[in-house]
């Protein structure tokens, strides 16, 4: 989605040379389970351990809902959820196979569609971003809103709308100055 172009500081992972069950191995495998196809994530199977609450899902603008008014598609490209066979409301944290939507943001598939180098698909080549340009933009905007010196609201709004233009693929998700609040910045951090 272009977000990888914003990486400033990353922990590099290589499926052949940095084998660990932590890092992005954990993120990709633990978020895969239920009726998900692990091949679509570029791994050999899931650990069935991570889903999100509906409150997190609701931070994204839905573009489609099912008969129960549960979101199934989103305008924001950052909303990467597996919904098939999953419930919208995660009321049982012990039940991954059906409780809550799974997040599919981290995959062992490159931006060109290539699967990682580990032939067994145990260990991903997916790098873990520690600092991204998006974080810098969000920090700038938060500092301005908290009264920090040296910044201005118009620049902060411009930075936030750059993130949203990337996320929506157009200016359709951009916000107005009146929408730029600390609560909005907190929600935007979650979406990023």
How should these model regions be labeled?
Residues 46-47, 54-57, 153, 175, ...:
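Generic detection of long, well-ordered alpha-helical segments
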Residues 1-137, 146:
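Elongated scaffold/linker segments in the mid-to-C-terminal portions of large proteins
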Residues 125-166, 170:
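Extended amphipathic alpha-helical segments enriched in small hydrophobics
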Residues 160-191:
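Conserved catalytic neighborhood of penicillin-recognizing serine enzymes
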